[in-house]
Amino acid sequence: PPPPPPLELSSAASEVYKRQSPHYVLDTNLVGTLNSLEFARKRCGNMIFLSTSRVYSVTAQRAIPLREEPKRLSIDTAATLPEGLSGNGISETFDTAQFRSIYGATKLASELFVQEYCAMYNLRALINRCGVIAGPGQWGKVDQGVYTLWVAAHYFGQQLSYTGFGGTGKQVRDLMHPDDLFALLE
């Protein structure tokens, strides 16, 4: 049987790296993807690439019409919504053309490399834009692992702190455990 496809998930996991060392982010994300693509091209002909929701435009995300509810913010579906946005959230057709971040730019460039390899070398690939993945091995540090920080705050009876949207804590993010992601990809 053919070997299983490599799972390419090169990423500078810490926000500190993303801000202080663009070279490190570029080497890790883009060069890591290129190395994985070459392996897949020469060895098995397919791969799975885990990208990120950070490829979507920050400007477009900030312009999402929101409705404040008692316990959360929701997409205001009564407003005119841009392409790729619905009451279910953001799809793969949402804006990627405007400002995103150095990290998001390298992951979007990696997606383009994957598409080019598929066209040039008949590589078969799956690109999955993950949101927040949290589980074993994630550390409760200021520069990564916000959910781990929240669990620790709850455990030790400390106040939670929120960033953005007026610090209300009403913003909503999907959280995926690595086991669930693995089951999805299987």
Regions found by a protein language model. Name each.
Residues 61-88, 102, 112-182:
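NAD(P)-dependent short-chain dehydrogenase/reductase
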Residues 106:
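Active-site helix of classical SDR
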